[in-house]
Amino acid sequence: MSFSRLPLALAFGLITSLGAHADILNKPVSLKTEGDLVQAVSTTLQHAVAMSEQYRGTEPRLQRFARNEINARRKPIEQLNKIGRIQPMPVKQLSVTPTDDAAYLNAMLRNHAWLIELIEFGRSLPLSSNTKRLIDTLSRDATAELAALGKLEQR
């Protein structure tokens, strides 16, 4: 990149980050311990639930997906919060409300891809057997849901 374009690139990056700061998935994450992983995964799941609760679209398949997402994520969030001895964050305040079907679909694709990435990286950490079991289950579920979302995106 030439130095003449540097100010433009910095300004664009600043504008982009200011517009996206409200979404919790844009916050930096440091995964150094099992507790960090548990916190990050719990927050990502809470984000998915908050987005699904706020979704008011018209697509029946996405409505069904949102209901299933809410029901499927409650128990793992509770388990993660118990394992990590953490208090749930007010994620509803930190997620961007989906404005339509496409926005919700994109938000869920992003959320699930981020969840899978967190889990894959987190597997390199020393994990207790309970956490490892829960993380493995979440990984399988998130991968299957990401595939289902991908099919919905193609329609």
Which positions does each model-derived feature cover?
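Bacterial N-terminal signal peptides
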Residues: 9-17
